[in-house]
């Protein structure tokens, strides 16, 4: 049995884990970043890197590589169940997730973090009800890794979160999705001009209820070769089957003529890959004695309201700042870590969060009626006053 000690151990080298490791290592903290897979590795995702995560990558010196590997989206075309359309301003990068995760893990290492890939964490070590490290399998050996703080960044439906009793599955909090890559998608060349001036499509349909379809050109050759990340995401695990989502996409593309035209010559170049995530209504406890929870494991996002990667990145920096504050105070208690984390992340009060959740449920329920998005998109296109009041400048 190998025993090692670090200031911070981070379980999971996805965006949240790697960004947290980079910030901590940059501040001089001894960080060990553990990842069960080997990079580069693929992961089902919409591949949209919005302003939030991009700002963190800029702060960590990683944005230039992202820029070179991405399509830059300038607008979104929204399409309703009846085929109503409007174009709205929306900016993000679109780079394949396997590239994003590679860039971020390499960035963490450049700043001084130690990365161990193909290292599977099998459990947490606790002493007097405080998390003090992890047990893992690495290169065929059982290892014991001790730390002052453990960051739990093992993704949605966190196995470590479940072992602590802080994450409980709630069907209405779950989102399930499928995505695949297509080539030769017929993009509107007046909107898709080059790598740095492109558009994406979001579709709302009776086929998804509370959810959406997307078509996003991705990577440096997305516009040139019509390479797009194509997918669907729906809310409420009990209402949908994973395998059914692909059928819904093909039915949608057949029902909306302009979408059908986009896929007349398109060829799928990857398998459909499925994924699940929890939204903020799951109510995951974010910290306890000796640990914090970040990224998808913390269930911090609301699809259609926030993007998951930016929420993950924000939580990563907040947890890094909280750890630094805890070390200065010599206090890694759950109460102190939670207070530091909340202050850094600017988490809303319970009252405000409850109101946000009510609005989220209202939005989701309204989307069961496709006429809601039909009318919304119609007004965005035809009513300048409505458009101005509902779109951020």
What are these regions (language model features)?
Residues 236-322:
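FAD/FMN-dependent oxidoreductases across multiple families
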Residues 109-258:
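Predominantly flavin-linked oxidoreductase catalytic cores and closely associated redox partners
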Residues 21, 29-31, 150:
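Hydrophobic anchor at the start of a short beta-strand
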Residues 25-45:
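Glycine-rich FAD pyrophosphate-binding loop
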């Amino acid at each position: 049995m190998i025993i090692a000690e670090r200031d911070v151990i981070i379980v999971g080298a996805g965006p949240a884990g790697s960004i947290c490791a980079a910030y901590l290592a940059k501040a001089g903290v001894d960080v060990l970043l553990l990842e069960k897979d080997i990079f580069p590795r693929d992961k089902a995702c919409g591949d949209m890197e919005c302003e939030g995560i991009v700002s963190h990558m800029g702060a960590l010196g990683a944005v230039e590589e992202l820029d070179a590997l991405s399509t830059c989206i300038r607008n979104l075309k929204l399409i309703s169940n009846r085929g109503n359309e409007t174009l709205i301003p929306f900016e993000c990068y679109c780079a394949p997730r396997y590239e994003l995760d590679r860039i971020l893990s390499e960035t963490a290492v450049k700043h001084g973090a130690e990365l161990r890939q193909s290292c599977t964490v099998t459990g947490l070590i606790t002493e007097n009800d405080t998390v003090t490290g992890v047990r893992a399998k690495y290169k065929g050996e059982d290892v014991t890794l001790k730390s002052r703080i453990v960051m739990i960044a093992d993704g949605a439906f966190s196995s470590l979160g479940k072992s602590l009793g802080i994450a409980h599955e709630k069907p209405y909090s779950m989102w399930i999705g499928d995505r695949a890559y297509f080539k030769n998608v017929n993009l509107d060349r007046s909107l898709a001009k080059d790598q740095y001036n492109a558009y994406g499509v979001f579709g709302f349909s009776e086929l998804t209820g509370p959810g959406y379809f997307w078509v996003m050109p991705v990577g440096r050759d997305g516009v040139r070769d019509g390479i797009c990340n194509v997918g669907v995401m729906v809310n409420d695990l009990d209402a949908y089957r994973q395998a059914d989502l692909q059928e819904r996409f093909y039915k949608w593309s057949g029902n909306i003529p302009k979408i059908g035209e986009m896929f007349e010559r398109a060829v799928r170049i990857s398998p459909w890959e499925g994924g699940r995530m929890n939204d903020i209504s799951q109510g995951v406890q974010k910290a306890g004695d000796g640990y914090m929870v970040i990224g998808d494991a913390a269930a911090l996002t609301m699809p259609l309201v926030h993007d998951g990667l930016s929420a993950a990145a924000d939580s990563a920096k907040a947890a890094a700042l909280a750890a630094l504050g805890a070390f200065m105070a010599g206090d890694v208690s759950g109460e102190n870590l939670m207070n530091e984390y909340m202050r850094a992340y600017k988490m809303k009060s319970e009252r405000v969060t409850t109101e946000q959740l009510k609005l989220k449920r209202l939005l989701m329920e309204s989307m069961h009626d496709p006429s809601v998005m039909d009318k919304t998109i119609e007004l965005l296109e035809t009513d300048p006053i409505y458009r101005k009041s509902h779109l951020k400048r």
